[in-house]
């Protein structure tokens, strides 16, 4: 969506909701007979995002009862414009809550309504996603949710853990994903602080990924890929280019690592979905004011490694890493 439009909407969201007092807990009364309708917009079918949706549904069903909630789960096949269509349809149906899975879904939802509560998940950085300057951890208005951001400084440290002599590291990301750039900026600074030379390798979409990556890996000792939806959808392409060159890849999340990486410090997307579902229950069942709900995080990311690729690249796995189970 257009950042300018979103920047205009966000202050209006706060003022509109503050004026209407939509979530005043003092006047809230839970109707045990009500059947809630929840719209779920997911940018694309992907193992990590799928787990987040599953966790969300499980938590809500357990909290409300399966017979008291109806989910309308729709996927946008990777198209932000389709997210907008989906979210607008949810607004027309007057759903009780929208769960937006991934940044494009959140942006579309934010642009579709100022009244219906919106919970994001699998969103790396809400300040970046919603163009909020000096983001303090609470969006305000009708938006909150959970973040899939893992400690980026610790991900950067993994490069030296697995490739001790690394001096030149590439940073692969899709230029269309603002959250990817945020991660790259942070990791790059951490690597440079360790006297590692970095090289940004950005591509526009899946059509130019192969050409861009192939033309930029010469001389690299390792590659870092952030949590990036386009990269996650194209791990087979990345693997087919990097593995023959014996180029180890540190990844931002588990499913990406399972497809092409050697190691990751990854959050649990199912648990993240559960946390998002618990936030939904606080809103729907307890009348909690979403405008005051801070963004939630998985505070226990796990160090994981891809056994097959580590063995093929003859890489020694440090203690404390758990093998990724490839489904």
Predicted ranges, named:
Residues 72-134, 228-243, 247-252:
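Beta-alpha junction/loop-to-helix N-cap segments that form part of ligand/metal-binding clefts
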Residues 178-247, 253:
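Pocket-lining segment of extracytoplasmic ligand-binding domains
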Residues 38-40, 56, 144-191, 289, ...:
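An alpha-beta-alpha
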Residues 21-23:
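Bacterial signal peptide processing site
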Residues 16-19:
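C-terminal motif of bacterial Sec signal peptides marking the signal peptidase cleavage site
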Residues 32-57, 63, 72-82, 228-230, ...:
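Extracytoplasmic "Venus flytrap"
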Residues 256-308:
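Flexible loop/turn connectors
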Residues 30-31, 126-168, 267-288:
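Hydrophobic alpha-helical segments within soluble ligand-binding/sensing domains
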């Amino acid at each position: 969506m257009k950042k300018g439009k979103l920047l205009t909407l966000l202050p209006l969201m706060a003022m509109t909701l503050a004026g209407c007092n939509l979530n005043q807990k003092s006047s809230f009364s839970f109707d045990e007979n009500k059947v809630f309708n929840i719209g779920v917009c997911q940018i694309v079918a992907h193992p990590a995002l799928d787990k987040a949706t599953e966790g969300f549904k499980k938590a809500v069903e357990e909290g409300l009862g399966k017979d008291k909630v109806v989910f309308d789960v729709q996927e946008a096949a990777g198209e932000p414009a389709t997210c907008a269509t989906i979210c607008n349809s949810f607004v027309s149906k007057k759903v009780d809550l929208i769960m937006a899975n991934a940044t494009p879904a959140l942006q579309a939802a934010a642009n579709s309504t100022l009244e219906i509560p919106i919970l994001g998940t699998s969103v790396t950085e809400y300040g970046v996603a919603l163009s909020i300057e000096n983001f303090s951890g609470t969006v305000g208005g009708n938006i909150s949710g959970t973040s899939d951001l893992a400690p980026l400084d610790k991900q950067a440290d993994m490069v030296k853990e697995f490739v001790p002599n690394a001096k030149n590291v590439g940073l692969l990301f899709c230029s269309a994903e603002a959250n990817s750039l945020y991660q790259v900026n942070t990791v790059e600074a951490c690597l440079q602080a360790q006297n590692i030379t970095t090289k940004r390798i950005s591509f526009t979409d899946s059509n130019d990924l192969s050409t861009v990556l192939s033309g930029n890996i010469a001389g690299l000792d390792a590659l870092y890929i952030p949590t990036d939806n386009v990269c996650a959808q194209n791990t087979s392409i990345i693997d087919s280019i990097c593995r023959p060159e014996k180029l180890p890849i540190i990844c931002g999340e588990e499913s990406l690592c399972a497809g092409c990486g050697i190691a990751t410090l990854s959050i649990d997307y199912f648990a993240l979905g559960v946390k998002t579902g618990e936030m939904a229950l606080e809103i729907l069942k307890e009348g909690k004011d979403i405008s005051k709900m801070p963004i939630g995080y998985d505070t226990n990311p796990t160090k994981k490694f891809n056994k097959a690729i580590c063995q093929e690249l003859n890489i020694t796995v440090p203690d404390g890493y758990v093998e990724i189970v490839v489904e």
